[in-house]
Regions:
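Active-site metal-binding motif and surrounding structural segment of the metallo-beta-lactamase
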Residues: 42-59
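Active-site gating/metal-coordination segments in enzymes
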Residues: 128-172
């Protein structure tokens, strides 16, 4: 959209924080890339350079996906930042958070800045790189949080690798509190799920297959939310 151009979106069903799940029929006037007016469908909009018929479509703010796997760098045979961004944009997502399970992992400033720059180059949606909780997502040593935060990272996760060491996770929570960053822990005690192929229960017992107990998740959630800290329990605000 060029600077100063106007667009009218007519006949769509508005779905946002002001509506219920059914939305409401309304028309939208956009000027210079900014929503200037939303009016009921039967009312007139100002004239515009372009008119879009959105009959039968949903018109909403852009969606944000907090967990995507763009695979770049290192696993481009599965996905790239450009192809993942294109898929996101086609689905109505204007921002995505890229998980750090790349090769190398997003545990250094240079990798984080590469991911962000590739997102800008693609120019299809905002690509927000996350950082690792631990170096290489290996659960052995904490990633350099201050360095990554200075590079613009605010969300840290080891993606599908839960941090198994309680002391290491406690240290991570303390840093998260002090640096005002957010941790996303994969809630799984891996020693309880080794070899599991389905939920634990009567079905897996009948089939003779190893089950995945709910306790594996419950224990990790309880552990994270029970950690004492030296100052307060504010660390709980730092975990999602």
């Amino acid at each position: 959209m060029r600077e100063g151009q106007t667009i009218n979106i007519r006949g769509g069903r508005i779905l946002d924080e002001t509506t219920d799940a059914q939305g409401r029929l309304a028309d939208v006037h956009i000027s210079g890339g900014v929503i200037a007016e939303v009016v009921e469908a039967e009312l007139k909009l100002p004239k515009a350079d372009f008119d879009l018929d959105a009959t039968g479509c949903i018109v909403s703010p852009g969606f944000v996906d907090l967990h995507v796997h763009l695979r770049e760098p290192g696993r481009e045979e599965s996905e790239t930042i450009e192809t993942g961004s294109r898929a996101a944009a086609l689905g109505g997502f204007t921002a995505v958070v890229a998980m750090p399970n790349t090769e190398p992992s997003q545990d250094s400033r240079i990798v984080v800045e590469f991911v962000r720059s590739q997102g800008v180059r693609a120019g299809l949606c905002e690509v927000v790189p996350s950082g690792c909780i631990t170096v290489g997502r290996a659960g052995q040593a904490l990633a350099p949080y201050s360095e990554l935060r200075d590079a613009g990272v605010t969300l840290f996760t080891d993606d599908g690798n839960g941090v198994q060491d309680p002391l290491l996770m406690r240290r991570a929570l303390e840093y998260a509190r002090d640096l005002n960053i957010t941790l996303a822990q994969h809630c799984e005690v891996s020693s309880l799920t080794a070899g599991a192929v389905m939920h634990e229960g009567s079905c897996c017992s009948h089939l003779g297959l190893p089950g995945w107990p709910a306790l594996a998740e419950e224990l990790m959630v309880h552990r994270v939310h029970s950690f004492p800290t030296r100052r307060s329990s504010d660390h709980r605000k730092s975990v999602v």
